[in-house]
């Protein structure tokens, strides 16, 4: 799935979008759901033309979706195995046979005061607990093993840049995989509705600092 053409497409797409896109809404999402069937920028632009939808909204969704997919396959370059079912929303990859959901995300705006130092184990574990506590109710009920690739830029546009900075992503993910294949994945207890879940979860911190 991961190839140089896709990397080039994502870089080109990045130059066509701004960071301050409008808030997602169900109506525009339904209009632009074709993005999930477009494996290239060319196909996405063609579908935008055919559907007559807002170009930047569709491109922004395609960029976020395809960078997330690309991120999953970066793990596979360094020893993970991708799930055979591309429609499986619960499992993206396996590391040493253990299933994981991969989330490419940004440092949450709600935590703009930076309460957690993601360069430390304690900070990462506190952030992981925050992520699980602030998921949608549907996701919380599943309580899956998760790997969070967290982009921490100086602003929203730098976070967008980081999502397709494959040199930096490969560097951080390869380092994580080398350690994890030899030492296992961080384990953490998450309490939800009085029930304790013992999960494997970690954060791969992406920053230019």
Where are the regions a protein language model picked out?
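Nucleic-acid endonuclease domains
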Residues: 1-89, 104-209
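Conserved catalytic cores of phosphodiester-cleaving nucleases, focusing on short active-site segments
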Residues: 93, 98-106
